[in-house]
């Protein structure tokens, strides 16, 4: 998750560069390597929360060509996550369709890339970071949910779904 294994060498422009990068990753991680076409453009994310719907988006602005694992996990001044509303209502409908077609349970972060006024689906991620300043929480805040609101909601829904609410004594904390 979080683009682990990705860095500035991950964007390649020739077969030789591709081969070198794939071999390096196979040696380092000893597992399959996913290769995708690179699409230039603006990164943005939305989230889906079952029972609430599509929230966000948040737009990632960073000084680097690639928003890598380190930037996602160690926040600094090179990354600015902005929120915006307005032009994204149609994208929210697309997120709802994705959630329905993939039968997403619980929650997911859906990443897009915008190029020439077109949105390209990059990935659907069900293993998201709940870092208070990360994309998932920032998207929730766009639609008025606080960190505590969204975390408590997700935990409560998960416990209801798994019928464990009373067996472990979980209690939602009121703010």
Predicted feature descriptions by range:
Residues 12-15, 144:
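Conserved aromatic
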Residues 5-6, 78-79, 131-136:
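Short small-residue beta-strand/loop micro-motif enriched in glycine and branched aliphatics
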Residues 1-11:
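A conserved helix-loop-beta module that forms one wall/lid of the active-site cleft
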Residues 1, 25, 37-38, 99-103:
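Short Gly/Pro-enriched turn/cap motifs at secondary-structure boundaries
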Residues 12, 39, 130:
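Hydrophobic pocket-lining residues within nucleotide cofactor-binding pockets
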Residues 1-2, 74, 127-129:
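Short connector loops/turns at beta-strand edges and beta->alpha or beta->beta junctions
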Residues 87-175:
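ATP-dependent carboxylate activation and anion-phosphoryl transfer catalytic cores
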Residues 15-87, 93, 114, 118-120:
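Phosphate-binding site of ATP-dependent enzymes
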